[in-house]
A protein has these predicted regions:
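The feature marks the mature, well-folded catalytic cores of soluble enzymes
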Residues: 1-299
Length: 299
């Protein structure tokens, strides 16, 4: 399993965002603590046996650490993002150039059709689950379906109401376990029609708004088939424990890398799906509304 991350050297919160209420320039992240948290995430991936690629950061692109948003990838084709926030729009050309060097073929949407990568387009078996309504235009879905030659399941995101924060990307609303055909989802993130549509292709386990708001649903699923190594040769304690558990309990499907703020209830639901939760403190990135999945582009 190949993953692309970007060093957090220039990560910052420099403005308010009308949709992402986590962002407050009066509560900016601690750069050194963010780097430590990001380093642990990289180490866990590396010691689980994943192929980790690291993109060098660009000083003025303070959000590019959230590599999941760069586009959607199937095979060697990449449909690059058209970001809604102005501050992120230069990321697309940078990552397109970076991915070309890795052998990928970048494609671009017409101007005015917004799309924010794996934040909203999540590969799920032979389909693509695609959120729209806040950061991704509904018109983008037809382009994704045509280019990737996969059925796209349109899922409209909605205001959850009751003073709750908007879950502006699909990846903030659920953990998508394609091999288990299961999604652990905060159902209030989707319209009723979209929820019914998702129920036709996945088993849905309800999660709390609190776990969604803490970005604990913004998690990376690592199947057992992608994990390599042995627990006694791994230095990171969490990765070592994962290797040990997978060796002891063959029925486990893999691990789910999630936030250290994940509730006990959520951890039990992950375990019920035969995955082991591996938690990482990513509190500095929560200040920008991001979690483990946002920080990780699965190649």
């Amino acid at each position: 399993m190949k993953v692309l991350l970007c060093w957090s050297s220039y990560f910052d919160v420099t403005e308010f965002d009308p949709q992402n209420k986590h962002m407050d320039p009066n509560q900016r992240p601690n750069v050194e603590l963010a780097a430590t948290q990001h380093r642990e995430l990289v180490d866990i991936y590396d010691q689980l046996g994943l192929d980790v690629y690291l993109a060098p950061p660009v000083s003025k692109l303070v959000d590019m650490v959230f590599t999941a948003n760069l586009g959607v990838i199937i095979g060697n084709k990449v449909l690059m993002s058209n970001f809604t926030p102005m501050r992120r729009r230069e990321e697309s050309e940078y990552f397109a150039s970076f991915l070309r060097k890795l052998g990928y073929l970048p494609y671009h949407l017409p101007q005015g059709i917004f799309f924010e990568g794996a934040g909203d387009a999540i590969v799920f078996g032979d389909k693509i689950l695609c959120g729209y309504g806040f950061r991704t235009s509904k018109r983008a879905l037809a382009y994704i379906e045509h280019l990737m030659d996969r059925e796209v399941i349109p899922l409209q995101l909605q205001y959850p109401g009751g003073g709750k924060r908007i879950l502006y990307h699909l990846d903030t609303a659920g953990i998508f376990m394609e091999d288990a055909e299961t999604v652990i989802l905060y159902p209030g993130a989707l319209t009723k029609e979209s929820l019914r549509r998702l129920e036709k292709v996945a088993n849905i386990i309800s999660a709390s708004y609190e776990d969604a708001n803490n970005l604990a649903l913004n998690a990376v699923v690592v199947p057992k088939t992608e994990i390599w190594g042995h627990f006694d040769k791994v230095k990171n304690e969490k990765a070592s424990l994962a290797h040990f558990a997978l060796g002891m309990w063959p029925e486990l499907r893999g691990v789910v890398v999630t936030s250290g703020l994940a509730s006990q209830d959520l951890k039990k639901k992950i375990e019920k799906c035969k995955y082991m939760p591996v938690t990482v403190d990513l509190g500095e990135f929560l200040k920008s509304g991001g979690g483990a999945f946002c920080l990780t582009k699965i190649l």
